[in-house]
Amino acid sequence: MTISDVPTQTLPAEGEIGLIDVGSLQLESGAVIDDVCIAVQRWGKLSPARDNVVVVLHALTGDSHITGPAGPGHPTPGWWDGVAGPGAPIDTTRWCAVATNVLGGCRGSTGPSSLARDGKPWGSRFPLISIRDQVQADVAALAALGITEVAAVVGGSMGGARALEWVVGYPDRVRAGLLLAVGARATADQIGTQTTQIAAIKADPDWQSGDYHETGRAPDAGLRLARRFAHLTYRGEIELDTRFANHNQGNEDPTAGGRYAVQSYLEHQGDKLLSRFDAGSYVILTEALNSHDVGRGRGGVSAALRACPVPVVVGGITSDRLYPLRLQQELADLLPGCAGLRVVESVYGHDGFLVETEAVGELIRQTLGLADREGACRR
């Protein structure tokens, strides 16, 4: 698609969900998705120059609702509550925080559960997408709103991969970036754990080759199992052992068919996801993570990163076993606009980027300071 910078739509009211039509989208693979819609929320007021936007990018099972209580269209509270608002790291007395639901998601944006032109869910017909495709859709949605340059992009995990593709692929449209708990490409360990999650979903007979949306049956057992396995990679080993050790769940006896405490905890995590997420989106977005490689078509990782002119803050979590610190160190070493790796001490593993709000809030403030300085240089 050709991205037009002529505004055709407007931002929704603060905290409400708006659906932005971006038309047909040609993917990196060459496939085309027609009638793409991207869900958007915002906090803060857009400046007259439209130059104060901070784009907040969610991880795998997130959505556009970054802060605030549950409400229409967002059945759970904000996943990064407190990150945006008056006096918050993204201070909405100055900045306008904008969050999208990613292409392929299930909270308003076009994905496998959305209706195609024939009035039926996309299901198995929804094509594989890449992180790069997700960012192209976000850029198009913002352009439809008349936002041609953003102050900063901020994200962790899959959101960090999206932020990385923003600064590498669209350096003229972003002044600074915060890359949290992410790497330049998918590792063998990540692909191994993530393809196993996909296999769990597809092994569920109710998967029905991905065309389950109108059958009254969904691969709930497979999605629960995938989430349990994923959640283990999100939390820290020491944290889990400190909380649960080898304890039984209450009065249950594992030797007599009962459960361990950590087993009960993981089952609860799987159950929670079922109430708010679609298995088809889980598969599509996990495949996008598997194919993540900022160096693809750009001469390799080193060449792609060294060519990026955008100032960035790179942050990693000490106990992250899904995206270990060596991956952020590579980004910090190769991105010319990075002044060194920022390390967040945490026992919470990969989820530390969500839990350690004070430390991460300071990294956000540093990123917005870079955006200010870069904005002065570009004027």
Curated annotation (Swiss-Prot):
Subcellular location: Cytoplasm
Active-site positions on this chain: 157 (nucleophile), 320, 350
Tagged with keyword Acyltransferase: yes
Enzyme class (EC, first level): transferase
Main location group: cytoplasm
Record's protein name: Homoserine O-acetyltransferase
SUPFAM superfamilies tied to this protein: alpha/beta-Hydrolases
Family statement drawn from the similarity comment of this UniProt entry: Belongs to the AB hydrolase superfamily. MetX family.
Domain named AB hydrolase-1: residues: 52-356
EC number, as in UniProt: 2.3.1.31
A GO molecular-function annotation: homoserine O-acetyltransferase activity
Binding of substrate, residues: 227, 351
Catalytic activity: L-homoserine + acetyl-CoA = O-acetyl-L-homoserine + CoA
Pathway entry: Amino-acid biosynthesis; L-methionine biosynthesis via de novo pathway; O-acetyl-L-homoserine from L-homoserine: step 1/1
Keywords of the record: Acyltransferase, Amino-acid biosynthesis, Cytoplasm, Methionine biosynthesis, Transferase
Keyword Secreted (UniProt): no
Gene that this sequence comes from: metXA
A biological process term (GO) from this entry: methionine biosynthetic process
Gene Ontology cellular component annotations, sorted alphabetically: cytoplasm; plasma membrane
Subunit structure: Homodimer.
Purpose of the protein: Transfers an acetyl group from acetyl-CoA to L-homoserine, forming acetyl-L-homoserine.
